[in-house]
Every structure is written in structure tokens, then in C-alpha cells.
Design a protein with these regions (language model features):
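Selective transmembrane helix interface/packing segments
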Residues: 1-267
Length: 267
């Protein structure tokens, strides 16, 4: 079919649309479309927090306040108390901010015509660096820089195996930085490519009917309804995936913080 012959070119064009293009300046020193929507997401988050603070009462009222309080309490109970443990209070502001920031960026990216701030590897790398520096800082603060470095090798391992284990653990620690960034980026990128592909299929199959209404074209356009139904299903799944990715990123950060502080307590 002619439609399927055009599909590879359409998919290639779709993928090229996800590349970073400058909105202001150039790629080396400017604002790309992902940076722009990252800024927009930050503004939206600040507005949401301001509205929530203004409407917050002793007894929550309204869908917005109740919904937002549920999200905050979920992060507090499941990630803060559940993962970090007794020291959760001092880490809660960072973890909650991280979760909400990633969540807002992921959700905005699902609105047609907008881009997710987390759709560029540079953005996810920056978030990963923040998380990495955060748990390293608290690890060093808990029992000193030298103590934290030495703690990477478990106690009870004799020389020279302890040196080998220390090198492996050091590599594993820095690998966290890469996995945090790549996991979030790849999941968001892949999801948008899949949605775009199904949208292309639906529009290409529907196009003959839109150009000339006839019974033959109507029958030929029926498969587009199936593609459209699948697209709607994938869109709903992407909403869930966007929330899950924000959760996974925040949970892993909490785990790394907890591990750093647990080592200090054991010493």
C-alpha cells in the first residue's frame, strides 16, 4: 500500500522533530525548545504551589487541594518514611520538589504542541547531577569525606580483595549518575515516539476520507479508527508512565541517600 511506503519517511521526520532546536540563540549558547518548556514547567509548578498554599485549610476542600495533598502525603509516606526512614523530614523538601518537578514536566509534554522538559538528555542529566551531588553531600556530611570514600568498601574484606571491591563500588556509585539520566530520558523519548507513530498511522489512513467522501474511502478509513483507539490507550498509558518515571527517579534518589546515611550509622 502507498500509505505504508510513506510510513518510514514519516517516522524519520517524527524522530527528527525530537532533536533539540534553538528557540533563542544557537545550540552552543541559547534556549532550545526543551529548555523553553522546562522553564514553562517551572513557572507552572510555582503557580500550582502558590495556589495550593493560598487555598490550603485545616480541612482540605475541593478537588485541587485534596488531590495535591494526596500527592504530597504519598511522597511523604511512601518515599520519605518508607525509603529514607527516621531522617525523612530533612530530605522531604528535596525529594518532594524533585518528584513534582519531573511529574509536571512529563505531564506538560503530553499536551499536543508542547515538549517535555525531560525529553532532552541534557535536562535529565542535570536532574541526575542534582540527585548525585545531594546524596554524596549527605554521605560526606554524615561521616566525613575520607570516611565516606572508605565506606564504599565493605568491612571484613581482606587486602587485596577490598581494593577490588572498592573500585567496583566506586564505579557503581558513578554509574548511578548515568542510569538516572538515561532511564528517564529513554522512557520519555520512546513513549512519545510510539504515540507519534500511531498518530501518523491514524491520520494517513483517515486522509483519503477527508479528501473525498465516498463509501469506498469510508471503508478504507475504518482501520484508522483502530489506530486511533490504540493511540488513545497509549496516551492513557503514557500518563501513567510519566507519573511512574517521576516516582522511580525520586525513589532511587531516596534509596541512595538512605544507603549513604545507613553506612554512617553502622560505623
Amino acid at each position: 500500500m502507498e500509505i505504508f511506503e510513506k510510513l518510514p519517511d514519516e517516522i524519520n521526520h517524527l524522530v527528527s522533530e525530537f532533536s533539540s532546536t534553538p528557540v533563542v540563540g544557537d545550540l552552543s549558547c541559547g534556549i532550545t525548545q526543551y529548555s523553553f518548556w522546562l522553564i514553562v514547567s517551572t513557572i507552572v509548578l510555582l503557580i500550582v504551589l502558590a495556589v495550593f498554599k493560598k487555598k490550603q485549610t485545616l480541612v482540605p476542600k475541593g478537588f485541587f487541594v485534596n488531590g495535591f495533598e494526596y500527592i504530597i502525603e504519598y511522597v511523604e509516606n511512601d518515599i520519605g518514611k518508607g525509603v529514607v526512614g527516621e531522617n525523612w523530614k530533612k530530605h522531604f523538601p528535596f525529594l518532594c520538589s524533585l518528584f513534582l518537578f519531573i511529574l509536571i514536566n512529563n505531564m506538560i509534554g503530553l499536551i499536543p504542541g508542547m515538549k517535555p522538559g525531560t525529553g532532552a538528555i541534557g535536562s535529565t542529566a542535570a536532574l541526575a547531577i542534582f540527585a548525585f551531588v545531594y546524596f554524596i553531600y549527605y554521605g560526606c556530611k554524615a561521616h566525613g569525606v575520607i570516611g565516606y570514600i572508605k565506606s564504599l568498601a565493605p568491612q571484613g574484606v581482606s587486602f587485596p580483595m577490598n581494593v577490588l571491591v572498592w573500585v567496583v563500588e566506586l564505579f557503581s556509585t558513578f554509574l548511578r549518575l548515568i542510569t538516572l539520566a538515561v532511564r528517564l530520558f529513554c522512557n520519555m523519548f520512546a513513549g512519545h515516539v510510539v504515540m507519534g507513530s500511531f498518530a501518523i498511522m491514524a491520520s494517513m489512513l483517515m486522509q483519503p476520507l477527508l479528501q473525498q467522501v465516498s463509501a469506498a474511502h469510508a471503508v478504507g478509513a475504518l482501520p484508522s479508527l483502530a489506530w486511533l483507539a490504540i493511540l488513545i490507550l497509549i496516551y492513557a498509558i503514557e500518563l501513567v508512565v510519566g507519573a511512574i518515571q517521576a516516582y522511580v527517579f525520586t525513589v532511587l534518589t531516596a534509596v541512595y541517600v538512605s544507603e549513604a546515611e545507613e553506612v554512617a550509622e553502622e560505623e
